[in-house]
Amino acid sequence: MATEFTGVWGRDSITLETGKWAKQAHGSVVYKTGNLVLLATVCAAEEPKEGQDFFPLTCEYTEKAYSVGRFPGGYFKREAKPAEHEVLLSRILDRPIRPMFPEGYFSEVQLLVQVLSADKQVSVQGHAINAASAALSVSSIPFAGPIAGARIGRIGGEFILNPTNEEITKSDLDLVVAGTKDAIVMIEGEASEISKEDMMAALRFAQEQLKFAVAMQEELAKKHGTVKKEVVLKAPDKDLHAKIREFAFDRLTLANKNADKAKRNDDIKAINKETVEHFKTLLAPEDKTKDIKHFLHELEYEVVRELVLGEGIRFDGRKTDEIRQISCEIDVLPGPHGSAVFTRGQTQSLGVMTLGTTSDNQRYETLEGSKEKNFMLHYNFPAFSVGEVRRNSGPGRREIGHGNLAERAIKKVLPTQTEFPYVIRLVSEILESNGSSSMASVCSGTLALMAGGVPISGAVSGIAMGLFSDEKGRFAVLSDIAGIEDHFGDMDFKLAGTKKGITAFQMDLKVNGLGLEVLQKAIEQAEVGRDHILGEMNKAISSVKGNLSENAPRITQKQIPKDRIGELIGPGGKMIRAIIEQSGSEISVDDSGKVTIASPSEESKEKAIAMIDGIFEEIEVGKIYDGVIKRIADFGAFVEILPGKEGLCHISKLDVKRVQSVRDIVSEGDKIKVKVISVDKMGKIDLSRKDVLLDN
């Protein structure tokens, strides 16, 4: 039976429909606002696969080219590999939805959100989260939702719910929040160095807006008559669990106090192996290896959390707000345009910068049309960084997401194209990882930019905050979490910013929601940590010369009249190609007449500028020019005195004495000095070498 709910959320009219399209899916919702139409579908396997011990959730967001009346690009003219922005939005769907499933639920779930009709002014992020949650809410799949998502902007100090794409370009905040009626589940976004107070105000505003979107979904599910499937989880063997606890708890506690990741992992593996062997022998012939390993993992979870919540001790002996040891090196590579290594504990990032020209802009397609980026940050996470062996198959969702977060953190401090007309590419090579590698990428990227002479408005540092909490109400917010604290913790909250304020943030949870008071403590504690990290970075920055690398191109920009662009390009591009070939510089011109010159050396730059200036220079009668013989005729020689401007030096004016043959005096390609005698109404230039010789 078809069910529909319509309501007004902020400035938007929202319609949710179910039971009309995609009825064989376990849950499906058509979500409409403006011209935007989303189809969200979800299906779940009846039972988990044999031996399954994790939750296999897949969330995918896809945009159909037909949604804006366009053909897909490429030879086959059909949608193929997801674009980077689709991958990023898929991650935004996954992160708030994953913690809302019951613990121990291991059936495979596939959630798809497709854009069937696009509205170029509607930002889709929050609506996509709502559509996904609504599909789960009307299904029988166990789900502790609904949750809602909203995008928040701020213009002129006023917060805006679901700003249009045009409004986002004017906003100093781009925040995507997901949550329940009374708790936050996920945060992601960027800002123009906002204060922690403004950040909290934005979260409070967002929390209020989410309530109505949650209520809409609840009303739809109620109308639809949704009945949730009861999940029957395997009852644990309490007796075996108690025996394993008695056998391994104290030893695991001691092993988890080792700050060295490799040594700690080796010790824990040895304890686990010994425990498994001991109980396999004890329980033979019954094989309970999987149960033993599961209980050991639960035991380590308990150990790590009790150390923090009960004793106030982190595995490496740090206080809850203490940052690991930091070291910074700059100019570590001679070839690149800028480089630095940032090390924090056992996490290390090599940041490498390359400067390019407008021809290096990244061009990409979205439903809003073609776009270009002049700054990009690419994050690489090789297997060796964590001492593993695996196939290198290129960047996955995690690499794309981490790179995007670091890129958003840094881009707010970059100079404008007018101030610094370069395209910038940063690469973060993770050399070793033990937590918070994306924030290490922010730090190494900032150092590489400054080492390479990019005039950024301020240094950016990043930190990852964690949380341990329990049912007794105890909680501890941890600064600069290591890998084990991320793995066993409840929160991974990354914040980046300058001394002035926050530039980027991302929060994931493993619990189904946090109150604003916990988030406020994390944001305040993060600011102290970021300031400490900036202090360590500044020690290295103080030695930076601030000059462009000798290997970097020299870029100059000139403005020429719009109506004379054709003169620079020349017929069939002849003129601009000649300047490029002769000067060795790369040259481009846009529709406004802005000319960009990228040169490998100062000499190349000066030559290109002189040739361009020459095109627009007015010929002066009586002035002596350095010319090049272009053609020879019986009656004289044609001499180029400025780019694209030739005059005739008649045979009678080639020398002070009588000339029998032009070739007796000059040949093609010869350089000679000539004086301009006259320029007629048709622009024909009369030249004389004879007058120059007589003057001398």
UniProtKB/Swiss-Prot annotation:
GO molecular function terms listed in the Swiss-Prot or TrEMBL record: 3'-5'-RNA exonuclease activity; magnesium ion binding; polyribonucleotide nucleotidyltransferase activity; RNA binding
Reaction catalyzed: RNA(n+1) + phosphate = RNA(n) + a ribonucleoside 5'-diphosphate
Keyword Disulfide bond carried by entry: no
Database matches in SUPFAM superfamilies: Eukaryotic type KH-domain (KH-domain type I), Nucleic acid-binding proteins, Polynucleotide phosphorylase/guanosine pentaphosphate synthase (PNPase/GPSI), domain 3, Ribonuclease PH domain 2-like, Ribosomal protein S5 domain 2-like
Domain of life: Bacteria
Subcellular location: Cytoplasm
Single Gene Ontology BP annotation: mRNA catabolic process
Chain ranges of the KH domain: 553-612
Record's GO cellular component terms: cytosol
InterPro entries: ExoRNase_PH_dom1, ExoRNase_PH_dom2, ExoRNase_PH_dom2_sf, KH_dom, KH_dom_type_1, KH_dom_type_1_sf, NA-bd_OB-fold, PNPase
Annotated S1 motif domain residues: 622-690
Cofactor(s) the protein needs: Mg(2+)
Binding residue positions for Mg(2+): 486, 492
EC number annotated for this UniProt entry: 2.7.7.8
Record flagged with keyword Metal-binding: yes
Gene3D superfamilies, sorted: GHMP Kinase, N-terminal domain (3.30.230.70), K Homology domain, type 1 (3.30.1370.10), Nucleic acid-binding proteins (2.40.50.140)
The family this protein is said to belong to: Belongs to the polyribonucleotide nucleotidyltransferase family.
Cited function: Involved in mRNA degradation. Catalyzes the phosphorolysis of single-stranded polyribonucleotides processively in the 3'- to 5'-direction.
HAMAP family: PNPase
Name listed for the protein in its UniProt record: Polyribonucleotide nucleotidyltransferase
Species this chain originates from: Leptospira biflexa serovar Patoc (strain Patoc 1 / ATCC 23582 / Paris)
